[in-house]
Curated annotation (Swiss-Prot):
EC number: 4.2.3.5
Pfam families the UniProt entry points to: Chorismate_synt
Co-factor(s): FMNH2
Keyword NADP among UniProt keywords: yes
UniProt-annotated binding residues for FMN: 123-125, 241-242, 281, 296-300, 322
Residue numbers binding NADP(+): 46
PANTHER family associated with the record: CHORISMATE SYNTHASE
Lineage, uppermost ranks: Bacteria, Pseudomonadati, Campylobacterota, Epsilonproteobacteria, Campylobacterales
Organism expressing this protein natively: Helicobacter pylori (strain Shi470)
Entry's cofactor comment: Reduced FMN (FMNH(2)).
Signal peptide: none
Protein name listed in UniProt: Chorismate synthase
């Protein structure tokens, strides 16, 4: 379907080369000050055309808020917003309108719906992720009210791994690299892929932490069975174009360890390690929430590739257009937005966990 979330619900619409894309964010509490500078900055972080390491397609990505905001504050009603597509070049896709691009959604969309929007992939395009970033900015405004911060960066490009994590450096980096020392090597790997008309995969690190030093995240976000925090995070991120795996905490490495090596021991001050990635039993345990999202190489490459057309005839696919050589770079920003949306949803869900919370609200009235 086209909706993410339960209490804070984002519904998106629009296609890559349509007039507009947009969303409706329902469930946002009233009285939250709308930070227009934050919204603009989040959109710029995802925006293309900023350097040679991302797509040359540079949309303005101005968010037009159509409802749910009055005199600078959320009203509690659905926040509707539009983002205009102004830099689409549909002619770049004329030569492939009847064939399936390898490892794209063309094949499955055509067989499911029987109708295919070949212009930039239509609804399956990562262009839709701009909506998630806009909605994530609103979620960040909510989380800021209770001292929760989400941030992200790149920890791996083409197998070249970061050795240090510096989220402040990532904000300044052209590729959002977390490790300044490894950044140039990672950039070279991307440039080599571009020279070879190829693409390259990568891994993003996303985390949530308390806005205040020496303070913890809220304990108990999420529910133990059918609204597990880690499950909702994984669902949101694996639903993003190009993400093939999501790890929480130690993730895959956990399967290689013994219990004595993995367990997070405790003392009176709290946990002595964070191999669980901030989630136990489907709920936040107060520690930083740590996620890794693994992105496949961009399937849009400029090498001749064998494929078939809509009549099942073999043919050659030679792409044109403007594409990211490494989707992990801009994808890291989208994952950060998705984590913000999931956490905001879980914050609202948590209001139902204790009768004391409801009494506090209604006894004040």
């Amino acid at each position: 379907m086209n909706t993410l979330g339960r209490f804070l619900r984002l519904t998106t619409f629009g296609e890559s080369h349509g007039d507009v894309i947009g969303g409706v964010l329902d469930g946002m509490p009233s009285g939250i000050k709308i930070d227009y500078a934050l919204l603009e900055n989040e959109m710029k972080r995802r925006q293309g055309g900023r350097n040679v390491f991302i797509t040359p397609r540079k949309e303005d990505d101005k968010v037009e808020i159509t409802s749910g905001v009055f005199e600078g504050f959320s009203t509690g009603t659905p926040i509707g917003f539009l983002i205009h597509n102004q830099r689409a070049r549909s002619k770049d896709y004329d030569n492939i309108k009847n064939l399936f691009r390898p490892s794209h959604a063309d094949f499955t969309y055509f067989h499911k719906y029987g109708i295919r929007d070949f212009r930039g992939g239509g609804r399956s395009s990562a262009r839709e992720s701009a909506i998630r970033v806009a909605a994530g900015a609103f979620a960040k405004m909510l989380l800021r009210e209770i001292g929760i911060v989400c941030e992200s960066g790149i920890i791996e490009i083409g197998g070249i791994k970061a050795k240090n994590y510096d989220f402040n450096h990532a904000l300044k980096s052209e590729i959002f690299a977390l490790d300044e020392e490894q950044e140039e090597v990672q950039k070279t790997a991307i440039q080599n892929a571009i020279k070879n008309h190829d693409s390259i995969g990568g891994v993003a690190l996303i985390r949530a932490r308390s806005a205040k030093t020496n303070q913890k995240l809220p304990i108990g976000l999420g529910q133990g069975l059918y609204a597990k925090l880690d499950a909702k995070i994984a669902e949101a991120m694996i639903g993003l174009n190009g993400v093939k795996a999501v790890e929480i905490g130690k993730g895959v490495e956990s399967s290689l360890l013994k219990g004595s090596e993995y367990n997070d021991l405790m003392d009176q001050k709290g946990f002595l390690s964070n191999r669980s990635g901030g989630v136990l039993g489907g709920m936040s345990n107060g520690e930083e929430i740590i996620i890794r999202a693994h992105f496949k190489p961009t399937p849009s490459i400029f090498q001749p590739q064998q494929t078939i057309d809509i009549n099942n005839q073999e043919c050659e696919c030679l792409l044109k257009g403007r594409h990211d050589p490494c989707i992990a770079i801009r994808g890291s920003v989208v994952c950060e937005s998705l984590l913000s949306l999931v956490l905001a949803d879980m914050v609202l869900l948590n209001l139902t966990s204790k009768i004391e919370y409801l009494k506090t609200i209604y006894n004040e009235n």
